[in-house]
Amino acid sequence: MDSQRNLLLIALLFVTFMLWQAWETDKNPPATTQAIQQATNAVTGDATNQGVPASGQGKLITVKTDVLSLTINTRGGDVEQAHLLAYPDTLGSDKPFHLLETTSEFVYQAQSGLTGKNGPDNPANGPRPLFTTTQDSFELADGQNELRIPMTYTAADGVTYTKTFVLKRGDYALNVDYSVNNTSAQPLELTLFGQLKQSIDLPKHRDTGSSNFALHTYRGAAFSSSEDKYKKYSFSDMDENLNITTNSGWVAMLQQYFATAWIPTTAGANTFYTNKLGNGQAAIGFKAAPVVVAAGSQQNLNATLWVGPEIQDKMAAVAPHLDLTVDYGWLWFISQPLFKLLKFLHGFIGNWGFSIIAITFIVRGVMYPLTKAQYTSMAKMRLLQPKLQAMRERIGDDKQRMSQEMMALYKSEKVNPLGGCFPLLIQMPIFLALYYMLMGSVELRHAPFALWIHDLSAQDPYYILPILMGVTMFFIQKMSPTTVTDPMQQKIMTYMPVIFTVFFLWFPSGLVMYYIVSNLVTILQQQLIYRGLEKRGLHSREKK
């Protein structure tokens, strides 16, 4: 097998990849815009009238740290808005990324409360609790490392509920602590819950789609339990509601680069559930083990809420396996170590683009023995072509005998007919793993390289890199010996660089740059290997 046929194999692998991506997109089709209907009784007011609560609504208070800007509704104490201050909405924008949102077009909230027989959030006990606060806005001051937002509600029976949000500097994980002071004469049966609720259909301004070719990123729910470290649960899966009991884990809503998650921290078994609401919304949540607060006693209940980017090391520190929410697809076992290596290199280099170039040299250096074996195998196969042709003429149409004698010839000449394919079969998963890494790692979102490349996770706006990639592919093809004599195959090979250039027009610029550098290294390695093969009589220069 010669290098031209290797290019055909690469093309076949690419087509297979594209078909698989198309199947994934069909399985989880992007949602279309749809008007959000009236919220259910568990939903708080519309945030379009912020600061002017409608009848039955609570007051909207604002909370700001160095990394988060939140809006909390005092009716129930739900987080209705969340902006990520360190992440622009789009490249070059002054607006921070809008993660949680409550508008007439789209609802995405982090809810929590106390249900159970005596819970103030139990619909059977009336409207959700209306908390009071000492002020309408809270902000983390300079030199302050922790911000506490206490909210108090006193029920008709005299029981006092204090819901406190605790935020820390530089942290996307916030604690939600409930303190129940039962001053009544009766015990209270309570169940802590946390829920993430989101509109199933995306309005245009929330569309996370990309112009990258065949790109599909997951948007939906996920959870981790005692039995499953990480499991996606798409909106379509919620036609059959989740209902499991676990002693550990978390529930989450995911999208490209960002996530929200509830992590129960109260001891005991938790119930994880999903629910498709009748208003075009879906929810995933947890219910903690029920507790009984004796008359005249006090009880604390708590959970942790993650609202932010999918930063793997920080998420892993918050909860086991929470870092698995970074969507590296089915090649996660390659993408994860690749990203760790890339991050290590970035610590020294300081530029993600040059780090990708460095990792390309490392990968190709490690692959060099296989590459050398590939070219040696192809050279031996070329030398066997006259013997194989003579064998075909001698044996004729007896396929079984031809196959037997071919294998005997390969064995006697110590040639592996698949030796030229094996290195490619290893390189393609690495290439695809890098693709997923670029699409799933928030660190590479809007990461600049140099000159006109301002975002390595987006396509080259001027298509310069794909054209350069096609040029390098053309040179590799011209420098490679060929045994292809079929006119149709020759025509296909002639247009292969053009076809690949078109493929790469919409690929992330970081991935195209990886392929360009990989091709340049291939050219250098090719010349080095050919010189060695010439000395062994396995290769001769030929004019193309």
UniProtKB/Swiss-Prot annotation:
Region annotation (Disordered) maps to: 112-132
Q: What does this protein do?
A: Required for the insertion and/or proper folding and/or complex formation of integral membrane proteins into the membrane. Involved in integration of membrane proteins that insert both dependently and independently of the Sec translocase complex, as well as at least some lipoproteins. Aids folding of multispanning membrane proteins.
**Which locations, inside or outside the cell, does it occupy?**
Cell inner membrane
UniProt topology in membrane: Multi-pass membrane protein
InterPro entries associated with the record: Membr_insert_YidC, Membr_insert_YidC_N, YidC/ALB3/OXA1/COX18, YidC/Oxa/ALB_C, YidC_ALB_C, YidC_periplasmic_sf
Source species, please?
Pectobacterium carotovorum subsp. carotovorum (strain PC1)
Annotated Gene Ontology cellular component terms = plasma membrane
Q: Where are the transmembrane segments?
A: 6-26, 343-363, 418-438, 456-476, 497-517
- Lineage top rank: taxon: Bacteria
Q: Which HAMAP family match?
A: YidC_type1
A Pfam family that the UniProt record links to this protein: 60KD_IMP
Q: Which family does it belong to?
A: Belongs to the OXA1/ALB3/YidC family. Type 1 subfamily.
Indicate whether Chaperone appears among the record's keywords: yes
Q: Its Gene Ontology biological processes?
A: protein insertion into membrane; protein transport
CDD domains the record matches: 5TM_YidC_Alb3 (cd20070), EcYidC-like_peri (cd19961)
Q: What is this protein called?
A: Membrane protein insertase YidC
Q: Which keywords does this chain's UniProt record carry?
A: Cell inner membrane, Cell membrane, Chaperone, Membrane, Protein transport, Transmembrane, Transmembrane helix, Transport
